[in-house]
Amino acid sequence: KPFLILDGSMGTMLQKRGMKPGTIPELLNITDPDLVQSVHRDYARAGSDIVYANTFGANPDKLAGTGYSLEDIIQAAIRNVREAAPDCLCALDIGPLGQLLEPLGTLSFEEAYERFAAVVEAGKNADLIVIETMADLYETKAALLAAKEHSDLPVLVSMTFQEDGRSFTGTTPEIFARTMTGLGADCLGINCSAGPETLVPLLKEVLANTHLPVAAKPNAGLPDPRDGSYSLSDADFVKGILPALEAGVTVVGGCCGTTPDTIRALSAVIGQGIDVSRIPYEEKSFVCSALQGVTVDDVRPIGERLNPTSKKRFQQALRDRDFAYLVSQALEQTEAGAAILDLNVGAPGIDEVTLLPEAVKRIQSVVDVPLQLDSSNPRALEAALRVYNGKPSVNSVSA
């Protein structure tokens, strides 16, 4: 198929069909499966090829104390899709955890990873995994690693962006696309955020920065604060997203405020045929933190002072685990104009496997420029790459 059609909003439809305020939507998979199945069925009839299981908020923390296990909820959700939409692919839908990761919050990267891994393990019998509405690149990475390391399913990764073109934590579509492509995602997308016209330029930026299929799931405009209704008609929604389809977006559906009627209108227009001229993917050497990207197409100044070679003070700081000193050196170099910082903690008596990832986290909590991880120890590099937020450069590794 030239296009795959996703479903629309589950929350909007549950509210329209009588879900009481304060209800945890995922519990309805067990307490009112007929209601959930009615939504799935209507999206399938409207033309959806892929239907999302009602698991967006299903995670160990949110379901704690409900009396239902994570596996029970997720398996019921998948069963509801299978029964109501047997001809559609079933996506395990994974949303944010609802907690900020370090350094913005208290949840560690590995703690986030373990929570996502539990969700993936509970839903491995879905046809694919969708990680969506993510606002933090670091949390998105934790979710994608969990999906890839705990299943063999294809993974669609979708972030949400604000009016300034950055995510809540400051990531751009370019950084998102380059990082998630490098981590092995199978499809990239943007969802929620705003209406389709707002998403089009952001989607074009994603298209230019990945060779992967790109997905769009916009809102039906903006909500009315008086009654919660959304501003766009189905015809205007389709008209608004059409330029993205013409530019190369091939996976499309709707988020907040969209209904089966929206998907039906979208399916009808796609069925008439769309002339597509995909924005070309720009191959380039690119490194980034979560906030700042550097295209390596010319000479770039790299700060080399985060290296213990012939630096007794730096060696002592490593032995003392004096990360404040490392951070001060990083800050001085960025203020002097370094575009990338080389980081090496290899010295006699130093456990690089432990120290390098910790140094990465400490420095990235303060400095925005990308890092170049410098080590001849593959295990240390692997540990550091795992916790790095963005797409780093790697230096000195032996083949």
Predicted regions and their residues:
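Domain-level signal for soluble alpha/beta catalytic cores
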Residues: K1-A399
